Amino acid sequence: MIDLDIPDLDIEDLDPDLEDQTQKNGVEDESGGALTYAVIGSGQGGGKIAKAFYDLGYKKTVAFNTAQSDLALLDLPDEHKFFVDHFGGQGAGKNQERGKEAYEAKSQEIFNKLREIFGENIDRILITVGAAGGTG
């Protein structure tokens, strides 16, 4: 069993500049399933897995990465990609502590992106990672 230390984040009450209805619904899901899933892809491996879900119709998908070059390789609409710019585009260099530092520094922006894409009406969130590098 993997012991994950997921901290509680103090997220300030900032709303992204969105229309109320868009904020409530987020991106329209096209999967046709009984439940509405949202997918988070972290790092290069997680981003590729998230992209596969996007291609299956799970449009409430966001790929995060600290390496801009890895995000550029993903065939996702730009609004579904989030560059965690903390190291000048060079990524976390397979160092998980640097990845953690980057995500903590950008936690509010990450939260806003998730809220923009996911909206408020989701049933489950899948988090996909490769776990071999610094961001996943």
Label every PLM stretch briefly.
Residues 1-136:
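Tubulin/FtsZ superfamily GTPase core signature
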